[in-house]
Amino acid sequence: MVRSGGTTLVDGVALRLAPASRTALVGASGAGKSLTCAALAGTLPAGLEVSGSLTVDPDGVGSGNGSCADSDQGGRNEGTNLLGLPAARRPRGCRIALVSQDHSTALHPLIPVGRQISLASQASGRTLVEADQRATDYLYAVGLDESLADRVPGRLSGGQRQRVSLALALAAEPALMIADEPTTALDVVARAEILRLLTSLTSLPEAPALLLITHDLPAAAICENVVVLHGGAVIERGPAAQVLAHPEHPVTVAMCEAAAEETIDGALAAAGAAA
């Protein structure tokens, strides 16, 4: 639950995310997606109150009212509730990595991207040699050539910077990767590439669970499960194929109809441009 003073902004969002699974949290603007994302990532603005639980164990990530154990390389922290703890205070082995839609906050403008990924890997407990090798591996995993490692973010395209953000998140070796509107401001080709990449990342060894935050229902189709938010509450959930093809709640129905119209309009516009 997220509250501001006496007002409840988000309530009853219970999730159970298995390793390497893909879940989409969808909703229109103001539905509560960003607040839920911030609560999970430990980046809620000051002044907001949060209650509930967020736990990590070998079987995945859980949020809601339950509890489970989380572990790191140095021991066990039985039943640690991460919700309400800022990201910097969360114990190792319980990392939740956030891929923000805003590259300017995710990437340092003056440090070469390969160095940034290496530093993130070192912060996860890797030696310098290991971290440098992993930086190369992570660049490769997100479809970037290691020759780009020496470039600062400003010398990369928007799609390349988003890929670097994904590599940076992987370097944290998280149990959960939250991708917050990762295709915002990308062109159609870059958008499709990022969605394909997100799908492929969950097939990596020791892949994290993926939580995709989006208002874009076609993007949600890459996920196995969909959770629909409206007014800070869950109104519908289930397998993506079922929810997107046969929505039950009126709000979800309206969202699917609007998405279908946008898809048709986009196809017509593309056809007109090609003519």
Task: Give the role of each language-model region.
Residues 61-97, 115, 123, 243-247:
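ABC ATPase NBD coupling module
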Residues 99, 244-275:
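C-terminal boundary and immediately downstream tail of ABC-type ATPase nucleotide-binding domains
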Residues 130-147:
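Conserved ABC ATPase "signature" region
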Residues 152-156, 160:
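Conserved ABC ATPase signature
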Residues 173:
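Conserved catalytic motifs of ABC-family nucleotide-binding domains
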Residues 221-228:
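Conserved catalytic segment of ABC-fold P-loop ATPases
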